[in-house]
């Protein structure tokens, strides 16, 4: 049918520019112990074994859903920093933009603390293995508490291509983790 032909053409024109990976068990353990000392090493190991790589829900989805490595609850005004256990390898002229899942943003005003998370292509090679962290806040002005069970999608990442200026002369090389390029 004509619909199948259009879908097939669209699939052929989609750019395959990235791949998700898990960080090492040691990196996940370190991140979890720093932020969540209440969890035992055995509990963190179990969380790591249950991590899911981000994936699109449908063929038409632009966003790759990121899944909560552990259950969390956010009352209005509360913030949490989540080590996802995920890293993203992508072509040089692409960026991964991170947003809350639409439903959580709409129902609870769940927001990224930096509005949009930006994962640069060279972050993959940083000292922390390019471990993607997400800091989110329940900005509800209706008194709504959000509960996210472990393994549930809570954020989404969208790959976007970008350009540079004709006279760009950036030569720096990333070696640190989050926020290291501003030091």
Where are these regions (language model features)?
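Non-catalytic terminal segments and appended small domains
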Residues: 3-183
């Amino acid at each position: 049918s004509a619909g199948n032909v259009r879908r097939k053409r669209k699939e052929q024109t989609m750019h395959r520019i990235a791949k998700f990976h898990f960080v090492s068990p040691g990196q996940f353990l370190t991140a979890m112990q720093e932020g969540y000392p209440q969890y035992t090493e055995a509990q963190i190991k179990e969380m790591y074994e249950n991590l899911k790589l981000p994936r699109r829900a449908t063929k038409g989805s632009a966003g790759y859903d990121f899944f909560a490595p552990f259950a969390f609850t956010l009352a209005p005004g509360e913030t949490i920093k989540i080590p996802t256990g995920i890293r993203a390898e992508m072509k040089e002229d692409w960026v991964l933009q991170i947003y809350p899942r639409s439903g959580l943003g709409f129902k609870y005003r769940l927001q990224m603390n930096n509005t949009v998370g930006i994962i640069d292509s060279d972050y993959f090679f940083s000292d922390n293995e390019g471990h993607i962290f997400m800091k989110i806040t329940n900005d509800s002005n209706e008194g709504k508490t959000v509960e996210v069970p472990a393994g549930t999608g809570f954020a989404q990442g969208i790959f976007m291509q970008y350009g540079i200026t004709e006279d760009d002369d950036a030569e720096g090389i990333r070696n640190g983790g989050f926020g290291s390029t501003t030091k």
